Regions:
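Short aromatic/hydrophobic "clamp" motif used to bind/position activated sugar donors
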Residues: 91
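Short loop->beta transition adjacent to catalytic acidic/histidine clusters or analogous donor-positioning motifs
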Residues: 7-10, 31-42, 50, 62-66
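Glycine-rich, basic loop-to-helix element that forms the pyrophosphate-binding segment
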Residues: 70-86
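C-terminal subregions of glycosyltransferases and related glycan-biosynthesis enzymes
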Residues: 2, 211-287
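A conserved acidic beta->alpha catalytic loop
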Residues: 29, 44-53, 73, 95
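Donor-binding/catalytic cores of nucleotide-activated saccharide
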Residues: 75, 96-203, 210-225
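N-proximal low-complexity "stem/linker" segments adjacent to membrane-targeting elements
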Residues: 1-31
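Acidic helix N-cap motif at the loop->helix transition within catalytic regions
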Residues: 21-24, 38, 49-57, 99, ...
Length: 287
């Protein structure tokens, strides 16, 4: 049974850039959440389509919506600007072309409340034109109740490195912001967040639906794969290696396997893309 205590304010952060076709679906799923004590922060990142007008329409009918308008600066800065003004005890990130089940926030809040968790994570599923219904399996959760267990689960890919799909205690975010990488900004961000967490609940029920499209940020990044991507990843893995090896020496082999996996993935990607040579991948990792 859900805990219906709405005393704690939850801030939902939604960066928006040219998603007019999908935005209403996203916002409808958010404003109709069963958990009502919400601050909904929309950040229009210089959209050139009708996204801003859609945001203004929703703001006019829901007093919980806060609308920020900025010049196009990227998703990282949009999220950071929202974090700077967010008032919630917990923070959730949702992408503007995605949507969530109506009990999404309530389910995650129930987990953080019941287990005194720092983070609750929902299972996610990618959808294209077909809208999939949430599959709810009672008690289908995993609890990671110490930092070593959390880091091990993260390194073994049991825990997501995506900002979306999580409810995060505000205190974990007070000193953390997204770095403005062309890619891997979520990965960079969550290395640091997970290192602070003591209890994480992973709900294996699907309540977050991400839309798979060729013109989204991830689609564009795949098409424009370049050395900028590699430099961003190198920065992340350098921190990854230094920080995690020092703090978790007992997980050394798992840490190095993750670094190797990233290298192999990027070497393979470089072989596919004509604008980056495989030798450039090796050169970057040797420096």
């Amino acid at each position: 049974m859900y805990n219906l205590n709405y005393k704690q304010l939850i801030s939902i952060i939604i960066p928006i850039y040219n998603t007019q076709q999908y935005l209403s679906r996203c916002l409808e799923s958010v404003i109709n959440q069963t958990y009502k004590n919400l601050e909904i922060i929309l950040i229009n990142d210089g959209s050139t389509d009708n996204s801003l007008s859609i945001c203004q329409k929703y703001k006019s009918k829901d007093s919980r919506i806060v609308l920020l308008n900025q010049q196009n600066s990227g998703q990282a800065l949009a999220r950071n600007n929202a974090l700077d003004i967010a008032k919630g005890d917990y923070i959730a990130f949702i992408d503007s072309d995605d949507w969530v089940s109506l009990d999404y926030i309530q389910a995650l809040y129930n987990h953080v409340f019941s287990y005194s968790a720092d983070i609750a994570i929902s299972a996610m599923v990618g959808c294209n034109k077909q809208i999939k219904a949430a599959e709810i399996i009672p008690s289908n959760i995993n609890i990671f109740d110490n930092n070593d267990a959390i880091i091990k689960a993260f390194l073994s890919k049991q825990l997501s490195s995506m900002a979306c799909g999580s409810l995060i205690k505000r205190k974990l975010l007070d000193k953390q912001r997204f770095r403005n990488f062309i890619a891997y900004e979520d990965l960079d961000f969550f290395y640091k967040i997970y290192s602070q967490a003591q209890i994480i609940v992973k709900d294996n029920n699907v309540r977050y639906f991400y839309y798979q499209r060729d013109d989204g940020i991830m689609g564009a990044n795949r098409l424009n794969f370049s050395l900028q991507h590699l430099q961003a990843l190198k920065s992340v893995t350098t921190y990854y290696e230094r920080f995690f090896i020092e703090k978790y020496p007992q997980l050394g082999s798992l840490i190095y396997m993750n670094i190797l996996r990233h290298l192999v993935d990027n070497f393979s990607e470089a072989a596919v893309r004509k604008n980056v040579l495989a030798k450039d991948v090796l050169l970057l990792y040797k420096t």
